[in-house]
Amino acid sequence: MVFLSIPNGKTLSIDVNPNSTTISAFEQLAHQRSDVPQSFLRYSLRMRNPSRVFVDSKDSDSILLSDLGVSRFSTVIIHVLLLGGMQAAPPKPRLDFLNSKPPSNYVAGLGRGATGFTTRSDIGPARAAPDLPDRSALATAAAPGVGRGAGKPSEAEAEDDEEAEEKRYDENQTFDEFEGNDVGLFANAEYDEDDKEADAIWESIDQRMDSRRKDRREAKLKEEIEKYRASNPKITEQFADLKRKLHTLSADEWDSIPEIGDYSLRNKKKKFESFVPIPDTLLEKAKKEKELVMALDPKSRAAGGSETPWGQTPVTDLTAVGEGRGTVLSLKLDNLSDSVSGQTVVDPKGYLTDLKSMKRTTDEEIYDRNRARLLYKSLTQSNPKNPNGWIAAARVEEVDGKIKAARFQIQRGCEECPKNEDVWLEACRLANPEDAKGVIAKGVKLIPNSVKLWLEAAKLEHDVENKSRVLRKGLEHIPDSVRLWKAVVELANEEDARILLHRAVECCPLHLELWVALARLETYAESKKVLNKAREKLPKEPAIWITAAKLEEANGKLDEANDNTAMVGKIIDRGIKTLQREGVVIDRENWMSEAEACERVGSVATCQAIIKNTIGIGVEEEDRKRTWVADADECKKRGSIETARAIYAHALSVFLTKKSIWLKAAQLEKSHGSRESLDALLRKAVTYVPQAEVLWLMGAKEKWLAGDVPAARAILQEAYAAIPNSEEIWLAAFKLEFENKEPERARMLLAKARERGGTERVWMKSAIVERELGNVEEERRLLNEGLKQFPTFFKLWLMLGQLEERFKHLEQARKAYDTGLKHCPHCIPLWLSLADLEEKVNGLNKARAILTTARKKNPGGAELWLAAIRAELRHDNKREAEHLMSKALQDCPKSGILWAADIEMAPRPRRKTKSIDAMKKCDRDPHVTIAVAKLFWQDKKVEKARAWFERAVTVGPDIGDFWALFYKFELQHGSDEDRKEVVAKCVACEPKHGEKWQAISKAVENAHQPIEVILKRVVNALSKEENSA
């Protein structure tokens, strides 16, 4: 490089080598850089004693710069030769200054005190003012760039400028926002590289300023748009919910909708209507347009069509052309679909779907990818040893669909970071399947200790033997890699796996899984040896002791003559003590988790041994019962039945006389055990807790359900011997005999119970037996005697009144109800029965008065309000019923039966609103839930209705009417499996309440009917009631 010092004081540089550059070449370069004519150039070196250098032009092509003493970084001073003469200079024209450039910082009129002002040219007119430059200057000078960033004009723009010059007006003149209509001081300046670089910098600054807070501005704008749309919804959105309901309208309802007419026509004045006949020319033209020409013009045939007049050529029908293209595409797809050669790669059925699913790249995504590409390019250039930069750059190219560029980037990453395994893994992923093996081979050569690379190399192999060979090669370099050992063992057969595991435990003696896997593959004797070695290497590992216990249990199962259950318990006990000596903290929760894991793999004895030895660790003595019961419940919820059974067994060994634990254990056996295990548990329970009635009764019931009536009778006799004065046992014995059609034995048992001073329930059961046997007088006698002893037991008064009603003795029935209300004034069933009787005999007014009296004596009685409302509805007093309903809801705002009745009474459009109000007041009430389910049923929303029916029977399983409605729903919309499931659940819940259910189940003809039969009869009753309504 040589520096040039030119006359205007600037210093330029020329990239030349003085040892190889001649004088003539240097003069040409100096001329190009300084614009000084080559013939006027004179130069000298900058030294302490500078000397002028003169070189003959003949020798300039052979003399080098170094011959003149010029070296690298020397400074050559350029001089311009001035030539003088004897002749005077020619005079300049008088007005020549008008065509020359003004000096810098020139302000017109400044010398005479003029000041600046603003004109229209500064602001900018509506049209650009004409530019009248000098023609001679335009002819000789090149057209300058206009404005910032303008380049060299094209040929089309030059032609436009020539036309504007002829018009003396430039129509394409631009307006500069800073300099007004004048395009700037540098309008005629040359647009060089510095200007281009400055424009690029300013453009990048503008883009940067525009990108700042762009996401925040866009999010704010989006939020404002959403707020505006939320506050000003469209009409279609306001009526969207109503439009959805239009599909429920039938065809007749659609036809009944009146047509809206244009009533504005009434106010319009009728104008005079004039009719003009169509001209014949128009009709003739239309006829010709529809006409189909089948013959050619003779002239056109003679000339071969070359003389066809252009104007008479018909216009192409573009619609028909488009339809034809669609037909051709359809035929092609049909041919492809019918192809049986198997060589086509087109799926004609999914062709259009694939076109729709093609990813469209937006401008924003392209911009983001370009930015990311530049960022990662800068990262890889500044820090090429960072593998993450190369991986990220390759993935950017991959996302952009440029897989070749991605492979190139990751290849460079492998070259720059050959010791990084992630780069090689990424290169393997991006490579072709046939090249991936070569890539991973290079990686393992450079990084032979990388486990990931060896595993990836094995994954690329398709043959099991090749996979195993690769993994074994990796183990030669990394013998202590557990992952490689596991992978190679998984691929080997049982014999090879045993050999490999022997070597694996030698290389990795502190890894438990390898020891356990080896113990499972060995024989019983060898497994014990392996586990002993593992215990020596890992003395603080509890899993070894658990595996030893499982091994002992499994060996005992194989050898039926040798029961190793006791040995399993000893192993676990010894293991816990050994671990405690080693300083291992026995975590009760972890050991219980291990017990559940043992249960899942079938090692029940090991599970029981773990629970027995660890369940009491860390539990206070006073908290043992509560903690153990809670643990058993949690295990039962998780499905760990054997673990829960082991917890109950250990708890019962500590708390032998706790009835609640025996009962929970019995319930567990009833749900998940066998009849034999339940019977054995109950026998053991009544041995330790003989005074527990519920345990005796449960044992007798299980025997009865199993069909063993004599065994059930024997259990009740033992219970009677243990608890002679227990009413529950007397009644259970009565029920057993009565349900098995032994009325005489049942009557005898009840007689003995009455003699021993039986309670009111004994007298009621006695009357029920006589009612079913048809002994009316005996039934009446028992009821009267029972009422003398227990006058406040309302059920006896109800039975007496119902007895008189059955035989149409209405006065005696009224007298029985009245007398019962004197003794039981707050018994709502008695008030309801009396009101129903009065409505039948004396009409609505009497019943209304009785119900009003009942409500005064029993405030807050929702059943009384409901009875009054239904009485009004039966007599078509809908307005009075609605009035009573409003008062009832004010008096009982939390009553579910009132809200359910209110939903059913409401008109169809208002039922949804009523149901929402009801759910707000009493969400968990089963009556409201069943009312909502019926709404969905009416709207034919089957799945929602089924979900709400299931919710109702879950909340109120004791109400038989809900099960009947659910079964009726499944009869219409469910399958046979659904109906069987509903019946099974109903039988399991044994419902006893419900208006229809109680009326039908307590009828004399249904006394001994099973629950399934009663369920179907309730459904029939509901269907009849619906049809009659």
UniProtKB/Swiss-Prot annotation:
GO CC term, one of those recorded: Cajal body
InterPro entries reported for this sequence: HAT, PRP1_N, Syf1-like, TPR-like_helical_dom_sf, TPR_rpt, Ubiquitin-like_dom
Keyword Nucleus part of the UniProt annotation: yes
SUPFAM superfamilies: TPR-like (SSF48452)
UniProt repeat feature HAT, residue ranges: 367-399, 401-431, 432-462, 463-494, 496-524, 526-554, 639-671, 673-705, 707-739, 741-772, 774-806, 808-840, 842-874, 876-908, 940-972
Expressed in which tissues: Ubiquitous.
SMART domains for this protein: HAT, TPR
Subcellular location: Nucleus; Nucleus, Cajal body
Chain's role: Pre-mRNA splicing factor required for splicing and for the turnover of unstable transcripts. May be a U5 snRNP-associated protein involved in the formation of U4/U6-U5 tri-snRNP. Involved in responses to abiotic stresses. Involved in microRNAs (miRNAs) biogenesis by functioning in primary miRNAs (pri-miRNAs) splicing. Required for DNA methylation and transcriptional silencing through the RNA-directed DNA methylation (RdDM) pathway.
Subunit text: Component of a pre-mRNA splicing complex. Interacts with ZOP1. Interacts with PRP31.
Further information: The sta1-1 mutation causes the stabilization of the normally unstable STA1 transcript and increases the expression levels of miRNA target genes.
Protein name: Protein STABILIZED1
